Amino acid sequence: MTDEPVQSSQPSQTLQISYSPCPNDTFVFDALAHGRVPGAPALDVTFADIDITNGMAERGESDVLKVSYAVLPYVLDAYALLPCGGALGRGCGPLVLTREAGADLTGRTVAVPSEKSTAYLLFRLWAADTIPGGVGEIVVMPFHEIMPAVRDGKVDAGLVIHEARFTYQNYGLHKLADMGEHWENTTGLPIPLGAIIAKRSLGTEALTLLADSIRTSVHAAWDEPEVSRPYVMAHAQEMDPAVADQHIGLYVNEFTAGLGEDGYAAVRGLLTRAAAEGLVPPLGPDALDFP
């Protein structure tokens, strides 16, 4: 599913960009995708869920992508982490849901949306700290199938993200643990969820312009949130507008405008801990530098 390329006021190559149809992404990119950021590069937008964009990044298939921070160790040779546009925050972490309150997950089956996701890394770090015997089988399934699978007893627990925070009780499920809460309590840092990356081959000038343009787009959305509403709701997959607003409020924040010292510390902290657990390759010392 693609949008037509938008012409910018400044001649430049059209950048292929892929991000999710989730409200936080469409809110952030609305002004930029619709040519309302003066001097910004033209974009050719493709919508894809983050598990798809993670794979696209590993194959080098797009100029700019919204990906999970968990995939960075695999792609930073070819892509640079942009200092804005992504999703970090507090109180917005993934949840582990069960049918019964207080269930013991030792040796139990857990459904996850992806094994290359920040949610999964946070889950494994939580499990390493809190389940000495370890969980059992990990089953990867599409995000929208996880809560029904837990409800129907097909799996013992499910790892969920995004708007499931607001809807899991509709399935009669219980929150066993909040991965973000565990992360924040043990590190004091925000939760790194989604990153914007762009090909290093675009060059310093283009990367800097892109980052500036994304930052401008974020501020435009904050200044006039009603302008982005049609774009957000057109791609929100029949989401209730109030849930879309909660989603935006949770995931679009100061770290979206700029990672800052805490944001970079959170990203490096997560990936360093994950590497120590053998979950991802180690990061080089300059891997997160921009541009």
Predicted regions, residues:
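Pocket-lining segment of extracytoplasmic ligand-binding domains
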Residues: 142-233
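Hydrophobic/proline-rich hinge and linker segments of small-molecule sensing/allosteric domains
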Residues: 81-102, 185-201
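Hydrophobic residues within well-ordered alpha-helices
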Residues: 56-58, 150-151, 210, 274
